[in-house]
Every structure is written in C-alpha cells, then in structure tokens.
C-alpha cells in the first residue's frame, strides 16, 4: 500500500499569510543603513532579494515552504521545490544552490520524509542546481521547501513593476490549481483535474525563463499564493493600467466547475479583499472566472510584460517548448481603474 501524507487545512500557497496582514507587519520592520549593493529587498513587492557582488554578478536569494496539498510524498517534494525555485526564474536568474527546509512529526514514518526530500532533490538537479544542505525541526505537521540561491547580471534583472504602456502580458501556466486541490482534498475533483494540476505544479519555470532572455522583457513575476490578480496588481505602476482578456486565460481542467461548486479557499477570499477594489470586471464575467483569477496558485507560471512587437515570436517559442502559454492582456496608459477584466 503506498505511503501517504495527511492533507493540511491550508496546503501549498493557500497557507500564506494574507497580503494585508503581511504588509502591516513588514511596514514596522527597521530598515537599517541603506546598502547600495542591495538592489532589491523586502521594501519592494518583487519575488526575491538581489544583492550585487560585482559589476557582472548579483546574487538572487529566496525561500519558500508550505504544508502538503497532495497525498503523495514524492510529488509534494517536487511541487514544493518547483515553487521555491520559481522565484529565481521570475527575477531572470539562474539557480545555483538550494538548502532543504523541513518540518516533520517525530512519530511519522521517516520513509515519507525521504520521499519528500527525494522529490525536492530531483527538481533541484533538473534546475541545474546543487542541493547543499538544509535544516529540520520536529513539528506537528509536515512542511517542506527550499532556500535557493541563484545569480543574475545586475543589468538584466527582471523586476515586477517596470512594465510600459503597450506591453503584452503573457502567462506561461494555467490557473486554478488551488480550486482543484481544494476539491481533491475532499474527493470531489472532476475527472482529470488533479492530474492536470499536478503536471502544472511539478513543471519548472526554467524553460520559460531561459526562452525569455532572447526577448525584450520589461517586467516579470511568478503567479503564486496572492493569485493572478494579486500579483498583477504588484506589476502596476503610476503609468499603466492592465486590460485582461478572460477568454484567453489558460485554466486547469475542471477548475471552473470547482468554483461553480464552491470549492473555494479562505486564501482566495483574502486575495479578493486585498485587491478587489482595484479590479473592474465586465458584467458578462462569470463568478467562476473571477474565482480562478483570485485563486491562490502553487508553483504557478511566469507572467511577462513583453514589448508588443516581440510578443508573437516570444509566445511561439514558449509554445514550441510545450508550455500552455497565452497572451492574456496588455498594459495601456493609466486609467481610472488599475485592472479591467473583459
């Protein structure tokens, strides 16, 4: 009989603290003396920290861990690792090293932990990185993830809020994994839904990031726990508004049905509360699509703002690599509402 791990109430990126609460806490942290080599820190909404160490090299640092959202230990390890590695790719970087972060009950079968860590190690190897160590503590619930270090040229960093009017928005993965995993937790996921979700969550964003280096990318982020609309809102600046074409959004098999059947998450509601007043939905947008756009993603895709004249060629290369990428909208000059969904 296969060994399984127990689902947690908030597995994957649904376990994140809400953005409002997090912003409140971070605002109170002391800044200390400004270091000119810290190119990106926690005072921005970017996906990782970036520290310049020479004229042609900067270190990219990130970490991510969470409870399980699937019952197979090896698959959970793969997903958790792919999710942690993604932040390096979102910054335009290359993965170098990773450290395990482990919380594990002392009375649980250690073979389960071994499978989780094997799944994570295999993804680090696939990313071209080296698993260099880690840290573990005894805990009441299973949690796993990675601290990851990568490198990027200081002049080629992808920031998330440097998009320009007329940029085309390209998303590299489907949305809706939170809805599907929530339905699967109670055995109600539609046929083929969890398989599609797992396939998406275990796919590295490495290929998408590497392909992007040949194009004029103005901004990038990865879509994770704060949802498509939450992370899109972090890409906005004073000069731009986002116009989203909901029909073009790639969606996980069965996710819209899961929304219609109210397999919703508290994290999605937090996302709606946080960013909902920045979004204008057209009257014909169904509730299920709204929920997909507010749905917390685990190991979600990259969202690129690319120069309009290069968008078609970029999308062609992404699709040629087997990615379910799509043009999902564009930036225009600032309007009354930050985000319009049509």
Swiss-Prot record:
Recorded GO CC terms: cytoplasm
Q: Where does ATP bind?
A: 16, 44-46, 64, 87, 134-136
What EC number(s) has UniProt assigned to this enzyme? Answer: 2.7.9.3
GO BP term, pick one: selenocysteine biosynthetic process
Question: Could you tell me what reaction this enzyme catalyses?
Answer: hydrogenselenide + ATP + H2O = selenophosphate + AMP + phosphate + 2 H(+)
Q: Which residues form the active site?
A: 13
The record lists Mg(2+) as bound by 47, 87, 222
Q: Where is this site: Important for catalytic activity?
A: 16
EC primary class: transferase
State a single Pfam family of this protein.
AIRS
Cofactor list: Mg(2+)
GO MF terms here are: ATP binding; magnesium ion binding; selenide, water dikinase activity
Where are the bilayer-spanning segments? none
Cofactor info, note text: Binds 1 Mg(2+) ion per monomer.
Q: Which UniProt keywords apply?
A: ATP-binding, Kinase, Magnesium, Metal-binding, Nucleotide-binding, Selenium, Transferase
In terms of SUPFAM superfamilies, this protein maps to:
PurM C-terminal domain-like, PurM N-terminal domain-like
Role summary:
Synthesizes selenophosphate from selenide and ATP.
- Into which family does the record put it? Belongs to the selenophosphate synthase 1 family. Class I subfamily.
HAMAP family in the cross-refs: SelD
Q: How does it assemble?
A: Homodimer.
The name of this protein is Selenide, water dikinase
Q: Which organism is it from?
A: Agathobacter rectalis (strain ATCC 33656 / DSM 3377 / JCM 17463 / KCTC 5835 / VPI 0990) (Eubacterium rectale)
